[in-house]
Amino acid sequence: KKIYTLFSALCLAAAAPGTLSAQNNFKLVEESVSNPDNTPAPVYPVPSERQLKWNETEFYAFFHYGMNTYTNEEWGSGMERETVFAPTQKPDPRQWLEVAKKAHMKGGIAVVKHHDGFCLWPTATTEHCTRNSSGYGKNVDIPKEFADAAREFKMKYGFYISPWDMSSPYWGKKDSNGKYTDEYAKKVFLPQCVELAKYGNDQFEMWFDGATGGDHDGGYGSYTSSQKRTIDNAQTYYDIPNLRDSIHNLLPNVIMWGVGGEARWIGNED
């Protein structure tokens, strides 16, 4: 945009009235103006394109289904036998998303592994998964069914996977010097995230919870005895920088929510 400014010519020489023309009295000057719309400078940090796109989702659903459905517990312990997961008919993620669609939601997140560690897909990382369940459970692959249904309804989809895992003997494990080992991150958590990423590069969110053990008892590899474990720094324990890069290489548009992610609680949660 440009503006035009009229400058009055200052005549210092004596002249008789009326001898100067209007052309000599005024001069038209063309100037370029920086920031003509007065756009404010950004106040850092500013959201990334990935975050802005994620924010457009606005209204979407969380679907909680898993081992706790059959134990009637809010949180499991990782000590549940796999055969307790025993659906008598095929779970129907399509029906879940159909209801969300009717509510004018734009997408959904399926909880495919909660703190008890039971995986709702036949993962290669643990025996604590649908592969070893009973009833129709042996045929369950919730991530696949959920992703297929989301594409059918043209909805966004993603997965919740708990970093905390009360079924894994590696979680919170320490070496002989009392230092946490990296076995869980390398052998379990990162491989599980990579497995989920392979269900579709059109995922919009991977949701990590921030729970870090503490007062809740877990089996940590045992079906019969429980113990308490915790970790001191989730960022380093889960190798978050490597995790973030690895997932973004597979899913360029996915937002990682929670531990070390790009979206988080707004600060008022209890």
Locate predicted features.
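Bacterial Sec-dependent N-terminal signal peptides
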Residues: K1-N25
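Mature catalytic domains of secreted/periplasmic carbohydrate-active enzymes
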Residues: Q23-D270
